[in-house]
Swiss-Prot record:
Organism expressing this protein natively: Solanum bulbocastanum
Keywords from the named record: Chloroplast, Membrane, NAD, NADP, Plastid, Plastoquinone, Quinone, Thylakoid, Translocase, Transmembrane, Transmembrane helix, Transport
Oligomer status and interactors: NDH is composed of at least 16 different subunits, 5 of which are encoded in the nucleus.
PANTHER family named in the record: NAD(P)H-QUINONE OXIDOREDUCTASE SUBUNIT 6, CHLOROPLASTIC (PTHR48479:SF1)
Superkingdom: Eukaryota
InterPro entries: NAD(P)H-Q_Oxidoreduct_6 (IPR050290), NADH_UbQ/plastoQ_OxRdtase_su6 (IPR001457), Nuo/plastoQ_OxRdtase_6_NuoJ (IPR042106)
Protein name, UniProt field: NAD(P)H-quinone oxidoreductase subunit 6, chloroplastic
One Gene Ontology CC term in the entry: chloroplast thylakoid membrane
Sections of the chain in a coiled coil: none
Gene Ontology molecular function: any one: NADH dehydrogenase (ubiquinone) activity
């Protein structure tokens, strides 16, 4: 997307905060339905990050596959479970939660200090001068389609067969 720098920065901060809040919602909310909806927020924000980086095909695949299929499947599976069992032994804070929180906070602080101490001056951005001219006239989705139908035809078909078998198995298990 060709946006001005302040708008781009604002969208990055907005989507980043959506990712953080959605991730916290996935982990901290006691109701699994609300956690699944928070996961949907995280996946939509990730898809919008792909749109900001001009990867429209990956963004569409993210929305269709993860939000449209996986997250709906998670919500569908959670709705089949008995909801009363989630609130029986719910303790607000345990020792394991404290240890996990301390480990995550220490990893976060070490990551922030590593990023801030790194010299970013020597990084050289690569150019597209050595690519073939004809590929510039094709969009990303056309290039992916060409590769899937030529170079990666056999792995693509094998993955589709494996997913079909898994779907049939899930339906058979759900019917019993």
């Amino acid at each position: 997307m060709d946006l001005s720098e302040p708008i781009h920065d604002f969208l990055l901060v907005f989507l980043g905060s959506g990712l953080i809040l959605g991730g916290l919602g996935v982990v901290l909310l006691p109701n699994p339905i609300y956690s699944a909806f928070s996961l949907g927020l995280v996946l939509v924000c990730t898809s919008l990050f792909y749109i900001l980086s001009n990867s429209y095909f990956v963004a569409a695949a993210q929305l269709l596959i993860y939000v449209g299929a996986i997250n709906v499947l998670i919500i569908f599976a959670v709705m089949f479970m008995n909801g009363s069992e989630y609130y029986k032994d719910f303790h607000l804070w345990t020792v394991g939660n404290g240890i996990t929180s301390m480990v995550c906070i220490s990893l976060f602080i070490s990551l922030i200090t590593t990023i801030s101490d790194t010299s970013w001056y020597g990084i050289i951005w690569t150019t597209r001068s050595n690519q073939i001219i004809e590929q510039d006239f094709l969009s990303n989705s056309q290039q992916i389609g060409i590769h899937l139908s030529t170079d990666f035809f056999l792995p693509f078909e094998l993955i589709s067969i494996i997913l079909l078998v898994a779907l049939i198995g899930a339906i058979a298990v759900a019917r019993q």
